Amino acid sequence: MSALAELKEQLRVVPPPQRAKALEKAREITRKKPWVPNPGPQTDAYFCLADVLLYGGEAGGGKSQLAIGIGVNEADRGIIFRRELTQTDGIEADGKSIIGKTAGFNGTDHEWTWFNGKSLKLGAMQGVDDWIPHAGRERDYMAFDEAGEFLEVQVASIGAWLRAPPGKRTRMVLPSNPPRSADGLW
């Protein structure tokens, strides 16, 4: 049973005045978030405590949205990779829709920057060694959208820079469909 299903079940037996209070509290909390996960698996993935999360599903199932949402809500310095930079156009459009005017977007660097210094970048790693230009840049969040398209060496190598100050959570999210070639069979 998902966390949301459990919560719904528990709320069913709560007296109406307390239930209304709990729902208002939930609305208040989510009002402060630019992005809120869909009920079900996406919510379970969002709140999952795993440091590295593989999130699969069918086309249109919210995998890329999850990558953006975690980056927007939780990361201080994040990056979302696709195998080719031209494949980030959908992520860029969705990100602009979610983020709006709360952050500036630099189209040359493919990066949003907030007034408080927080950033979320779109990147690519097509060739086996294309992780190298990203090396040395510590990030507290990395997502590999369509993870089954990446080489294991790319993810493992750049993952060494998934770091944060003490007390700050780091996350790697791997939204993916099944791999289309042997490259993704890791």
Language model features by range: what are they?
Residues 2-186:
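Phosphate/NTP-binding elements of NTP-utilizing enzymes
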